[in-house]
Amino acid sequence: MKRVVVGLSGGVDSSVAAYLLQEQGYEVIGLFMKNWHDDSVTISNECPWLEDSNDALLVAEKLGIPFQTVDLSQQYQEKIVDYMFSEYKKGRTPNPDVLCNREIKFDVFMKIALSLGADYVATGHYCRKGEIEVDGKPVYQLLAGVDDNKDQSYFLCQLSQEQLAKSLFPIGELTKPQVREIATKIELVTAEKKDSQGLCFIGKVRLPEFLQQQLKPKEGLIFEVDATNQIYNQEKINFDSVQEKLAFEAKDIQYTPEVAKVVGKHQGAHYFTIGQRKGLNVGGTKEALFIISTNVETNAIYTGQGHKHPGLFKKALFVTNDEIHWIRPDLALTNGQTIQVMARIRYRQELQKATLHQFENGLYVEFETPQSAITQGQFVSWHIGDELIGSGVIS
């Protein structure tokens, strides 16, 4: 009998995942990850992990499966929290959920599970795993979940073949309402529980407050750039090569105070991200102000009025070679190659038509239509059909 360790998070999805595996005849073990216990860094006044681990325990008891808690808070601190702080310091905006899956759930946690004699690790993610043969060897596919509203394959966009080989996603074929229905039918305590929000496993994080504990406030100016500014009317140059054109399209505009007017003050450019409109506290504009650029060197924030402001849009983005990740290495591009894909630059964004261009220095993702708020440090994922084949960090 194959043994599966399920990452029981205390939510309804992983609870039902454990039940389904049991029904399929696996020997199931429930393992709860505790990822946070540093009381010196308060992340929010509600620390849900106690309640969550208790719910996970109740689910395990109900299903009659062994249950253990494993404390990964030190690894979480090193691999996720410290990384987040260093990225924010550089003015980038990291995605903790993608990192948590790559570094914790499918790495540290998976190794613990395998050491318990598990054949597989299962989670409550809304995605599916496929298997095909390439050159006589098995190749694993990361496929979108059946529930369009809940597809979570994006969060797993950094997984490797080795990790996928050992993974199971029991609820990927179901919709959220179906999962709740099963939980209600078998009377799981988590049946009505609300979906967890926020930083993978730490509960609700108020980011600026969380960041302030390491990144000190530093007053700076908020500038507004008019949508009709000449900076947006650069002559379309005749480029010598496709690469030159893409580099131009992916480049961030370097704003200076000369092209803008001061409209307010902020407490630190590193707390803000492109596309953000909350937390600026600047009134009196005809339309809402959106952040179009932050500069941590000069501690300046540049904004524009309205969600259609030209400063928000770019047609291409760049990923450096060491931050390109192919879930399907057999599909990886070599220098000079291109491929048509569908891509997204954030969770739950509708997939966008795009072309990947691989050059010696890295990969360009060129979109058919300009994209709003392409953000450094976030992940771009690329897909063919319902398969996620690769991803990279936006540079």
UniProtKB/Swiss-Prot annotation:
Belongs to the MnmA/TRMU family. Its main location: cytoplasm. The lineage of its organism: Bacteria, Pseudomonadati, Bacteroidota, Flavobacteriia, Flavobacteriales. ATP binds at residues 7-14, 33, 124. Catalyzes the 2-thiolation of uridine at the wobble position (U34) of tRNA, leading to the formation of s(2)U34. The gene is mnmA. GO terms for molecular function: ATP binding; tRNA binding; tRNA-uridine 2-sulfurtransferase activity. GO terms for cellular component: cytoplasm. Residues 95-97 are annotated as: Interaction with target base in tRNA. One of its GO terms (biological process) is tRNA wobble position uridine thiolation. It is found in: Cytoplasm. This is tRNA-specific 2-thiouridylase MnmA. Disulfide bonds join 100-200. Coiled coil: none annotated. It comes from Flavobacterium psychrophilum (strain ATCC 49511 / DSM 21280 / CIP 103535 / JIP02/86). The record marks 125, 378 as: Interaction with tRNA. Keywords: ATP-binding, Cytoplasm, Disulfide bond, Nucleotide-binding, RNA-binding, Transferase, tRNA processing, tRNA-binding. Pfam families: tRNA_Me_trans, tRNA_Me_trans_C, tRNA_Me_trans_M. The active site is at 100 (nucleophile), 200 (cysteine persulfide intermediate). Its EC number is 2.8.1.13. It is an enzyme of class 2 (transferase). Residues 150-152, 346-347 are annotated as: Interaction with tRNA. It catalyses: S-sulfanyl-L-cysteinyl-[protein] + uridine(34) in tRNA + AH2 + ATP = 2-thiouridine(34) in tRNA + L-cysteinyl-[protein] + A + AMP + diphosphate + H(+). The keyword Chloroplast does not apply. The keyword Iron does not apply. It comes from the Bacteria.
